[in-house]
A protein has these predicted regions:
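12-transmembrane solute porter fold
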Residues: 1-168, 178-189
Length: 189
């Protein structure tokens, strides 16, 4: 129902924010997995453990963020989450081949905290902005924005890796190209 987008600014902008958020973040796990394995030389299991920083922090803070968005304006809580997410992306933009693993984990933890403060409160803002009869449509819009954002994120990351690394396998000789592709992705995000 397109009238929700044209007649309901909170719904429209919160939906757009969801699209932007998921487009900015979904490829982070793939990019950082490549970084940890090919730049830092970690085995896949160790890389996976480092990557856990984001979802663990997100899982720890999401329930509190949801409760906070019930007490405060969910749009403001989601905006704070988006700002913290942006900080996390800036921190990842600064990651290089000499960055210690704890810095990578800290940046991922910041992303997880931002994600927690954004996701539930943004969904709360969207669902609170529509009437009960539009819950189904609003819920499907949230799911669509999430899916389109995730697909966009992976498409951009794939194109950047292809553009910078090319068709060769990732190895020590093209680590600088991989780092450049990551920086472009995080910069776009």
């Amino acid at each position: 129902d397109m009238r929700l987008f044209s007649q309901n600014r909170v719904f429209a902008f919160s939906s757009l924010a969801a699209l932007i958020h998921y487009a900015a973040l979904f490829a982070v796990t793939m990019l950082m997995s490549l970084y940890l394995q090919f730049v830092k030389g970690l085995p896949p299991q160790a890389a996976g453990l480092v990557l856990l920083a984001q979802p663990v922090v997100q899982a720890l803070f999401s329930p509190a963020a949801g409760r906070l968005s019930d007490r405060l304006d969910p749009g403001r809580v989601a905006s704070a989450g988006m700002a913290i997410t942006t900080l996390g992306l800036v921190l990842l933009l600064l990651v290089g081949d000499g960055s210690p693993i704890w810095c990578v984990s800290a940046a991922l933890a910041v992303l997880g905290f931002g994600y927690a403060l954004f996701s539930s409160p943004n969904t709360n803002a969207i669902m609170s902005a529509v009437s009960r009869r539009d819950y189904g449509v609003a819920s499907s819009v949230v799911a669509t924005m999430r899916t389109v954002g995730m697909s966009t994120s992976m498409a951009v990351a794939t194109v950047m890796i292809s553009a910078f690394v090319g068709e060769t396998a990732i190895g020590p000789e093209n680590v600088p190209s991989l780092l450049q592709a990551m920086r472009v992705c995080f910069g776009i995000s």
